[in-house]
């Protein structure tokens, strides 16, 4: 039995409703993973070219500082030079040549192939991310996040049909040792879901241990390289325009070992990037193009995600404002720049500044998700569960945001216009021969599931019925859903034999009994 599936009800109307809520083939669903965006274009063609040219100038005239010794070797071997200021300069011709040979149309694999992603063109996928240091409960109380929280988040993501991949969302603050934190972050993530996983590491040795574990789960190193189901989120730059030493060392190993990398530049407009939105975008495009050259110098054609995460400051305080309209515009524009290069693009959306799942949270997430998704951004990170400008994570918001993402996906699909959908004959029949309404028409019943999207948590009942059922708000309904999933859904895709072997060789800190139903 699928623990994620809604429980069937036995009485007539509820049984019919449950049947309608059953899974449809992807081709018939009103929404599905990888829907085609691209209708919203915040930048004109001239704007895109201007940003591209500015990025090339920044790389060739300003360059990046603080390259590692091995990074210098890789970059100078393909044509980079060193300026009088000791910065790595990237000739325009080198950047253009790299763009011509960079990896395109590469899948992001999952442990279960049905969750494989095809993030190219203008296909849209929403997923989690972040390094929140707190959990927020249904009452709004904050506490430090731990390893069990990370595992529980992944278990819920595993059941959320509109959350298409799971990138590490919280920091296990109960693990002070950096090696144990990195290893267990990866272990808990891949154990909690069969969807594609993203994680990060602070030292190459930590990554080596995780790779050994991933080889065991895959069956062998060769099988891992055929279908790498974990990608590395790598903040290889410290904006503005500097390399990050530890991250670059991990980047080199990941590329060599066949792990896809998210080249993540997260400059904050008004703080670590220009306050002018166009300038912030140009800087981040330049930084990610530098990362692309770096990756291809290590291994030509290695899979790399163009990760322009343009963050925004509230200029009154200097603090990050992840739920702002400027954030929506920058992330949408970042997706548009990735289309210009025909690269798999990753950007961020859903980073509300609200501390709890309130009206502010819904408004900020809704406008950001709708704009960024309709811009056709391929991989939309931070999309579910986040609060307080990435400082907090809520399980209740995770399931609420699954609904918000679903609504955004429905706007991406748009309105299908053809002879049948224009409905001339249906209108004529109802007006001339029928009852004067469409409630029971064949077309209405046929399109009920394929044309219309219904919320999982959103309430559409009349006020009297809502009151009779306890007047629950969406947070209360989400809390019930979360507790039900946590009590019933324990993924078992990694065999007990493989798990025991992993535990025999590595310091797994997640108790096995916490990974089984009580």
Which stretches of residues belong to each language-model region?
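Catalytic-core signal marking the mid-to-C-terminal active-site face
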Residues: 2-30, 42-53, 62, 67-73, ...
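Helix-rich catalytic cores of soluble enzyme domains
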Residues: 141-378
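Short beta-alpha connecting loops at secondary-structure transitions
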Residues: 36-40, 317-322, 350-357, 386-397
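Glycine-rich phosphate-binding active-site loops on the catalytic face of alpha/beta enzymes
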Residues: 370-392
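Glycine-rich, N-terminal phosphate-binding loop and its surrounding beta-alpha-beta segment
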Residues: 65, 69-141
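Structural signal for hydrophobic packing residues in well-ordered secondary-structure cores
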Residues: 47, 59-66, 79-82, 99-106, ...
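N-terminal small/glycine-rich loop or linker at the start of catalytic domains
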Residues: 27-31, 47-49, 54-56, 118-139, ...
């Amino acid at each position: 039995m699928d623990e994620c599936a809604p429980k069937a009800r036995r009485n007539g109307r509820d049984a019919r409703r449950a049947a309608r809520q059953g899974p449809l083939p992807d081709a018939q669903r009103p929404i599905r993973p990888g829907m085609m965006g691209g209708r919203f274009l915040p930048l004109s063609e001239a704007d895109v070219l201007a940003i591209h040219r500015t990025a090339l100038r920044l790389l060739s005239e300003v360059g990046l500082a603080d390259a590692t010794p091995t990074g210098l070797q890789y970059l100078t071997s393909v044509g980079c030079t060193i300026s009088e200021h000791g910065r790595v300069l990237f000739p325009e011709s080198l950047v253009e040549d790299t763009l011509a040979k960079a990896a395109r149309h590469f899948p992001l694999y999952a442990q279960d192939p049905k969750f494989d992603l095809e993030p190219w063109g203008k296909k849209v996928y929403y997923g989690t991310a972040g390094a929140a240091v707190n959990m927020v409960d249904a009452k709004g109380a904050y506490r430090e996040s731990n390893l069990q929280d990370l595992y529980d988040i992944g278990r819920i993501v595993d059941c959320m049909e509109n959350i298409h991949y799971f990138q590490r969302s919280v920091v296990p603050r109960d693990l002070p040792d950096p090696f144990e934190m990195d290893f267990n972050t990866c272990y808990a993530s891949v154990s909690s879901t069969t969807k594609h996983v993203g994680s990060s590491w602070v030292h190459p040795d930590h990554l080596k241990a995780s790779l050994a574990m991933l080889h065991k789960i895959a069956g062998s190193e060769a099988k891992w390289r055929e279908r790498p189901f974990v990608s590395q989120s790598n903040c290889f730059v410290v904006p503005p325009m500097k390399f990050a030493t530890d991250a670059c060392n991990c980047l080199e190993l990941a590329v060599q070992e066949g792990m896809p990398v998210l080249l993540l530049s997260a400059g904050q407009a008004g703080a670590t990037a220009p306050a002018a939105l166009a300038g912030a975008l140009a800087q981040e495009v330049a930084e990610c193009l530098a990362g692309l050259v770096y990756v291809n110098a290590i291994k030509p054609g290695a899979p790399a995600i163009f990760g322009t995460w343009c963050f925004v400051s509230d200029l009154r305080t200097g603090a990050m404002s992840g739920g702002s309209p400027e954030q929506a515009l920058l992330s949408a524009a970042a997706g548009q720049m990735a289309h210009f290069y025909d690269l798999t693009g990753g950007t961020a959306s859903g980073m509300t500044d609200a501390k709890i799942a309130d009206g502010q949270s819904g408004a900020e997430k809704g406008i950001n998700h709708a704009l960024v998704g309709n811009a056709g951004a391929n991989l939309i990170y931070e999309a579910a569960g986040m609060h307080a400008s990435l400082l907090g994570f809520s399980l209740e918001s995770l399931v609420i945001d699954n609904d918000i993402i679903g609504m955004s996906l429905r706007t991406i699909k748009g309105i299908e216009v053809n002879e049948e959908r224009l409905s001339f004959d249906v209108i004529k029949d109802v007006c001339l021969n029928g009852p004067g309404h469409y409630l029971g028409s064949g077309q209405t019943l046929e399109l009920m599931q394929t044309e219309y999207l219904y919320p999982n948590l959103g309430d559409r009942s009349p006020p009297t019925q809502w009151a009779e059922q306890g007047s629950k708000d969406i947070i209360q309904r989400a809390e019930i859903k979360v507790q039900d999933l946590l009590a019933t859904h324990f993924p078992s895709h990694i065999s007990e034999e493989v798990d025991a072997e992993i535990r025999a060789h590595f310091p797994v800190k997640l108790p096995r009994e916490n990974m089984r139903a009580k």
